[in-house]
Every structure is written in structure tokens, then in C-alpha cells.
Amino acid sequence: MDSRRMSRPRQIKFEEGWSNIQKGITKLIRILEGEPEPTFYFSECFKLYTIIYDMCVQRSDYSQQLYEKYRKVIEDYTIQTVLPSLREKHDEDMLRELVKRWNNHKIMVKWLSKFFVYIDRHLVRRSKIPIPSLDEVGLTCFLDLVYCEMQSTAKEVVIALIHKEREGEQIDRALVKNVLDIYVENGMGTLEKYEEDFESFMLQDTASYYSRKASRWTEEDSCPDYMIKVEECLKMERERVTHYLHSITEPKLVEKIQNELLVMVTKNRLENEHSGFSALLRDDKKNDLSRIYRLYLPIPKRLGRVADLFKKHITEEGNALIKQADDKTTNQLLIELHNKFIVYVIECFQNHTLFHKVRVLFMCVYLFQQYYIE
């Protein structure tokens, strides 16, 4: 009896156990803050784990209190240290601090979860009422305390940096990528935070930016020069996606640019008397025609308008040829004109159905008509 009584593990009072645990937590925080502190040894980690384990399996089960303490440790550190460090910084310095604090937070949660891992097994998994895991508690603390306060300011700084890059300035793309990853990771497995708190505002700003560009460029540039700028803008925006935006953003971003730089100015650009679509056909500007086709290909309704302009042009040329040529040469000239348009359809418009139909229509209206007249 006496030997059994002696073999029972000593009951750890909560204050005593927590005091020892707190020493390990203090060391972890000092390491995160960059203060001189040796790294954790396995023996230290195992000691902390053992204390917490014993406090859960003994007669006085402190698992619920430890679970609550785990949350409070993270909340206190965040409120007392993390938030003040963020509030005192601005612009890119604030973004760098935010990235640093997010990375530190993940490290803190990772280490604390190792120390408190038995809480997950003993309390969280056995609870009749679902309660968050230690990882979920840790991430929620950052979401509620840091993300909710800082995301709006961070969004504005990132959008300002994107604007600078669009104007030709170099920016820290890696920093922007790391900041946007915070939006993604705080979505808890979804892209809701990224889409609602950043992407929607960035797309709105993009539309405004390119609307202003379109207004200026349509006044300053010929149609070919304008289209070169549009092509370059689309290329640069797609590069932005590869460097720091989430891949889900690309189709939305491209659509915004297409709408502002192509859809909204179709008539102004393509029907310009001096440098529009008809003028490019007249001057045999195949590269410029190919560019227009490539740019409007993803916009079916506007590509149809381009095909209509092609039809209008070849109709006018066909009518003019019939009026000017004599009966002996008309048929040959029409064949030559038709062959010329075949080159455009194949080389510039990739034999697209819309343009192919225009060529067939030309054959029906002019060549067959001329054949029957003869």
C-alpha cells in the first residue's frame, strides 16, 4: 500500500505548473523579438510538454484552464507588442513590419502548439461541443486583432505601390507578394479575405487608372500606337499576376483592362479616318492589323465589329473597282482583289470564321455576279 502511494505522481498546482510554462513562453517571445537567447533544446521542449501533460492527466485536470491560458498568451503578446510596433510604422515600413509579425506569429503558434499538443488530444478532440484547435485559436487571434485593424491600410499601400510600378517605378515585388499572402492565409482555407478586402478594391482602382490612360492616349496616339500600348499593358499586368497577385485575379484584371482600353474606345480607335482599321487595310499594315485581331479576339462582340469594318472596307473597294474598270479587266481585277483579301484573312486574322465569311461573301457578291453577267 505504502509503495503504491509513493509511486503516485505528485499533484501539480496550477500556479506552480503555469510558472514553469511561462518561463518557456518568455524565452520563445524573446527569441521572436530578436533578443539574445539560446535556441530551444529538445530537453526544454520535452520538459514543457511533460508539465502540461501531467497537469491534464492528474486528478486536478487543468486542461481547460491551460487552453484558455494558451489563447491569452497569444492575445497579450499581440496587443502589448505586435500592434504597437505596427501602429508606429507607415507605408512600406509598415508592410515590412506586418510581414515580419505575421511570420513571427506563425512561428509562435507552431512552437506553442508543440508544447500544448496534449491539449488538442485531451480536450479539443474529446469535447462534446466542438471547440477550435490550438492552430485555429492562434490564427484567429491574429485575424481578429491584427488583420482586421491593418488590412485596410495595407491594401491602400499595396495599391499605391502597384500604381507606382505601372508608372515605371521599381517596387519591392517580393514584399507585395508576402503581404498579399497574408490576405490569402487569413482566409482560413478560402480566398474570401483576399477577394473582398484586397482584390475588389484593386480591380476598381485598375479600371479608374486605365480609363484615365485611355482618355489621354486616344487624344495623343494614332490607332497603331495606341494598340501597341494596350498590348504592352496587358503583358505587364499578366506579369504582375505571376510576381505577386493570386492567379485567380488574372482573368478579372485582364477583363478590366480590355473593357477600359478596348471595349470603351472601339469606335474612336478603329473608325479613325486617318489611322483606323480601314486606313491600315488601305496602307497594307499587316502587323498592326494582326495586333488588332489579337487584342479583340478574346472579346467576341467587339471582334464582330472588327469583322464588320473588314466587310465594309472590301465592299467599298469592290464597288469602286467595278465603277472604274472596264468590262474586259473587271473580272481579273476582282480576282486580284479577292486574293489580296485572302492574305489578310489568313495572315492577319488567322482564318477566323468571322473574317472567312466576309471573304466568301465577297466571292458571292462580286466574282459570281460578274461571272453571270459575262
From Swiss-Prot:
Domain of life: Eukaryota
GO biological process, one term: ubiquitin-dependent protein catabolic process
Matching InterPro entries: Cullin, Cullin_N, Cullin_repeat-like_dom_sf
GO terms for MF: ubiquitin protein ligase binding
Similarity remark: Belongs to the cullin family.
Protein's name in the database: Putative cullin-like protein 2
Species: Arabidopsis thaliana (Mouse-ear cress)
